[in-house]
Amino acid sequence: MIKIIKYSNRLGKNKLISFLDHRRNSNNTDIDLVNKIINDVKKNKFKALKRYEKKYSKNVEIELSKNKISNSIKHLDKDVKKAIDYAYERIFKFHKLQVKNFRKIKLIDKYKNKLEYKSVPIDSVGVYVPGNLPSTLLMNCIPAKIAGVRRIVLATPKINNKLNPAVLYAAKKLGIKEILSMGGAQAIASLAFIQKVNKVVGPGNKYVAEAKRQLSGKILGTETMYAGASEICVLADKNSNLSQVATSLVSQAEHDPDSQCILVTKDKNLTKKVLKEVKKILSNLPRKIIASKSLKKNGLFVLVQNDKQIIETINEIAPEHLELNVKNFKKYENKIKNAGSICNGPNTPMSAS
């Protein structure tokens, strides 16, 4: 189900590089398809958008009424609301500090020239939120609100022909008025040519990422990260909580069939135990089919012999999310140069960050 590579020799290193390159390389068919969708939406606007939504998502309702949104939120579990409220507070506090510190960057040189960093909000931003990820909405929209972005447009696809009430609740909490039920490359094209926002942020599948790449710096503001399917790398040892390790891998695998989930360890027996935990989680997972495809296609266990190989492997993988699920994480953290976010310690899963 999940491939295993021994990193201890040149053959193993080459296998790892080949595994990573296979996923990173663009598919010309995808590029051409996305380009066709973009040009169609640019020319035919809502007519084309509705056609692609019906074709790919069986969705016939793009613009949502206030009543529909309110009715959906009414059925949201109270505990989920509490979790969103708590996450909102944490994210807001962090980014408020970020803006405060940006405004402190000032310098007056010996000639009395004043140099300073000025933070100016753009007028509008489109936020793409995959259907099951209210956290994505919070992490993208809260900074925009704090920065002073006047207009936020939310694009989120339906799952099984339904919008996630948790996403709608988070949007309401942030005062977002423009909520559109759409996904894929057609959603990015719509944000560029119909809603006409200045910039688009938020993760998505390979078609979303490719649409952002093609429009970046042309119609939309330049995007420095196209945020495709999710990536996670977990470092674990015999003292790690294996259920937590397996949960972290599966939690990213369920995002998308192209998500990448990698475990790095010195312990061969640990890989067998983690695989057993993964199978246990999958047996009760609503998104089992997606997660299973992801793990089969892009799941990997890397066996290393020493700490030097751990550092080499992680820096080669350059994961979006890295969990150092070991007690002695401090001996690794300063040597890791290529990782988006790092969760340090055995009780810091990525989902808690």
Regions found by a protein language model. Give the residues of each.
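Short acidic-hydrophobic, aromatic-tinged amphipathic segments that line or gate anion-handling sites
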Residues: 2-10, 178-183, 301-306
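A conserved active-site cap/scaffold subdomain adjacent to cofactor or substrate pockets
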Residues: 225-297, 301
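C-terminal core of ALDH-fold dehydrogenases
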Residues: 316-353
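N-terminal Rossmann-like NAD(P)+-binding subdomain of aldehyde/semialdehyde dehydrogenases
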Residues: 1-123
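Short acidic loop-to-helix transition motifs that present clustered carboxylates
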Residues: 110-111, 159-163, 182-189, 329
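Conserved small-residue-rich beta-alpha loop and adjacent elements
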Residues: 106-169
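Conserved NAD(P)+-binding/catalytic subdomain of aldehyde/semialdehyde dehydrogenases
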Residues: 175-260
